[in-house]
Amino acid sequence: MSPNKHNLIAPETALIGRATSITPSLPHAVNGTILNDEKPSNYSEIIIGMGCFWGAERLFWNLPGIYSTAVGYSGGFTPNPTYEEVCSGKTGHSEVVRIIYDPLIISLEQILTLFWESHNPTQGMQQGNDIGTQYRSVIYTTTPNQLTYAQHSKQCYQQSLEQQQLESPITTEIEPAGTFYFAEDYHQQYLVKNPNGYCGLGGTGVCFIPL
């Protein structure tokens, strides 16, 4: 039986996965970086999910200060999942974008401003017409300072929503990052390879105002 699309699966009932990981075989289709290389020293990494990862990745890859982006899966229980397994709802993972950036050129505030304004973070286990736990809104941080700022930014955006009479609570999951699993080559920089491909992103129309 398929899990309920609006409820995360329990760890003990998640798919068992596999020992072999998916390793990107192609460089980044926009900037040519090697996706599975170690990030350069003094660069930062954050993982975000905001619905279908095709459109989410496109938001970031051309921004000044972005070294690399990659799509994948995180936040669940199944090791080395496939796209089909994630879409089944039986892994607990969300579709995410790993962003490696130079904090001297682009700030975490700038990245999260785009995050908050470009999707609806109040929709729980869906984003627009895309329904399922893999489409939930998430921020997975890699440093304590990132975690603190991400939580603060959520409070700021909740206040901005309420000022515009949008009082639904933000459901974005904010946690220290666990393992990031690369998605298949087909999904990396998908909207470069398929310019007319699907993108279901849509924001609330409310601006993020730092407090």
UniProtKB/Swiss-Prot annotation:
Segments passing through the bilayer: none
One Pfam family it belongs to: PMSR
InterPro entries xref list: Met_Sox_Rdtase_MsrA_dom (IPR002569), Met_Sox_Rdtase_MsrA_sf (IPR036509), MsrA_MetSO_reductase (IPR050162)
Residues at the active site: C52
The UniProt record lists the keyword Oxidoreductase: yes
Top-rank lineage group of the source organism: Bacteria
Catalytic activities: L-methionyl-[protein] + [thioredoxin]-disulfide + H2O = L-methionyl-(S)-S-oxide-[protein] + [thioredoxin]-dithiol; [thioredoxin]-disulfide + L-methionine + H2O = L-methionine (S)-S-oxide + [thioredoxin]-dithiol
Enzyme Commission number(s): 1.8.4.11
GO annotation, cellular component aspect: cytoplasm
SUPFAM superfamilies listed in its UniProt record: Peptide methionine sulfoxide reductase
GO molecular function: L-methionine-(S)-S-oxide reductase activity; peptide-methionine (S)-S-oxide reductase activity
UniProt KW keywords: Oxidoreductase
Enzyme class: oxidoreductase
Family: Belongs to the MsrA Met sulfoxide reductase family.
NCBIfam families: msrA (TIGR00401)
Function comment: Has an important function as a repair enzyme for proteins that have been inactivated by oxidation. Catalyzes the reversible oxidation-reduction of methionine sulfoxide in proteins to methionine.
Protein name per the record: Peptide methionine sulfoxide reductase MsrA
